[in-house]
């Protein structure tokens, strides 16, 4: 049960931040957002506020933000349609009832002759279905079209995705992966504050373990190690290397303590790691507890992981591709099961790493991914006009189908690794 809760928390948080990026930048650009959904499948929770419906769905392995104009959805009332109109006191249309007119007793019956619900926002027709009573009404920008129990808000063209500038469209799509990186930065920064600091690379000693060789020799926390056996030490890595390479051998530590230099002999204990003997003196990594270090930790950790993940991706394509290099939901669940054993802080760290992974994967220039859409925007920038929407739709559909096939293969491979 703990693993299931952790899995839902991790995926839910990552997906929420990704979709939040799309949502906020769409709103900033003036794009109508019709749906903000976390998860796929049947609805667990639904709430509508103004023009947007917010939903949580059963499967927490994805989400979406549905923006006006993205899916080609448009409301068309052809000449001859008989509808009911609810009017405001100013005689503008607030509701267009297509089906279920009997439930709106005050609706004005009209037979449509001409209608524009995108640009000029008007409806013309014959009142009471009488061709001698021609009328024309302006339609409210937030008017609803009611078809039985389904209510759909009209989309003025200037509120649609495609009506916006190339820069606004590109930023709205890029904002999803961007917010995945922001989530990682926030988590790594929070962890630095909770843990009281970040590991330092300085050549100073951290906490001294009571029964270790360092404590027995008289070393203290905060001692600056100038050299070991005459070899200058400039960083914590230099100290670790010198100690590890000399198990059971007495080492001359030249240290600076409170401005005074002194020599202390330390004999590292011998321990086995991966079948090899190494030296240990019982000293923890020094911590940088400064405010600046805690704040910058989020950025440096995120950047280091980005570089590392891109390096792995490069090796995948240059060194030969294998399904074992990829993890689907089952593989991530299995990894989460292991991570949970080390506590909540480790789960948070795992969430940050996964969020960076999702951000990078979504930026890959593949159809159906955010990166694929950004490539089409680049094409539009170079060519001066967008690709034909039908062609783009076909390419995205083909890309989505290939991704689904790959996901099925990866998931099957995950199941075999986990259970067979």
Swiss-Prot record:
CDD domains in the record: cpPDZ_EcRseP-like, S2P-M50_PDZ_RseP-like
Signal sequence, start to end: none
Transmembrane spans: 172-194, 304-326, 347-369, 393-412
UniProt domain PDZ: residue ranges: 176-260
Pfam family, one: PDZ_2
Membrane topology: Multi-pass membrane protein
Name this protein carries in UniProt: Putative zinc metalloprotease Lin1355
Organism: Listeria innocua serovar 6a (strain ATCC BAA-680 / CLIP 11262)
Record lineage: Bacteria, Bacillati, Bacillota, Bacilli, Bacillales
């Amino acid at each position: 049960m703990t693993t299931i809760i952790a899995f839902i928390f991790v995926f839910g948080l990552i997906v929420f931040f990704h979709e939040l990026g799309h949502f906020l930048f769409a709103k900033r650009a003036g794009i109508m957002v019709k749906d903000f959904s976390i998860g796929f499948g049947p609805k667990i929770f639904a709430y509508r506020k103004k023009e947007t419906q917010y939903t949580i769905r059963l499967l927490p392995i994805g989400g979406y933000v549905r923006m006006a104009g993205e899916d080609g959805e448009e409301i068309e009332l052809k000449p001859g349609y008989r509808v009911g109109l609810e009017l405001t006191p100013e005689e503008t249309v607030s509701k267009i009832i297509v089906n279920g007119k009997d439930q709106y007793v005050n609706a004005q019956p009209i037979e449509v002759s001409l209608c524009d619900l995108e640009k000029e926002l008007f409806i013309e027709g014959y009142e009471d279905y009488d061709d001698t009573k021609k009328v024309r009404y302006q339609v409210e920008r937030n008017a609803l079209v009611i078809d039985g129990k389904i209510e759909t808000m009209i989309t003025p063209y200037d509120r649609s995705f495609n009506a916006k500038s190339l820069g606004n469209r590109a930023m709205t799509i890029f904002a999803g992966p961007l917010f995945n990186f922001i989530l990682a930065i926030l988590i790594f920064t929070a962890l630095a504050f909770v843990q009281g600091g970040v590991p330092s690379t300085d050549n100073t000693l951290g906490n001294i373990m009571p029964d270790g060789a360092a404590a027995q020799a008289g070393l203290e926390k905060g001692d600056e190690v100038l050299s070991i056996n005459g070899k200058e030490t400039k960083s914590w890595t230099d100290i670790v290397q010198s100690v590890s390479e000399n198990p059971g051998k007495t080492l001359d530590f030249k240290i600076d303590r409170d401005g005074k230099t002194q020599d202390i002999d330390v004999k590292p204990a011998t321990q086995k790691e991966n079948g090899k003997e190494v030296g240990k003196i019982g000293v923890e990594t020094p911590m940088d507890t400064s405010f600046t270090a805690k704040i910058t930790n989020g950025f440096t950790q995120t950047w280091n992981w980005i570089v590392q993940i891109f390096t792995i991706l490069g090796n995948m394509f240059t060194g030969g591709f294998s399904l074992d290099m990829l993890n689907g939901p089952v593989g991530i669940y299995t990894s989460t099961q292991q991570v949970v054993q080390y506590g909540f802080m480790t789960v948070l760290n795992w969430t940050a790493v996964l969020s960076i992974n999702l951000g990078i994967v979504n930026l890959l220039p593949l159809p159906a991914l955010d990166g694929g859409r950004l490539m089409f925007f680049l094409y539009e920038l170079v060519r001066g006009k967008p690709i034909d929407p039908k062609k783009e739709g076909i390419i995205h559909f083909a890309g989505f189908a290939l991704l689904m096939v790959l996901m099925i293969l990866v998931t099957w491979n995950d199941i075999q690794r986990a259970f067979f």
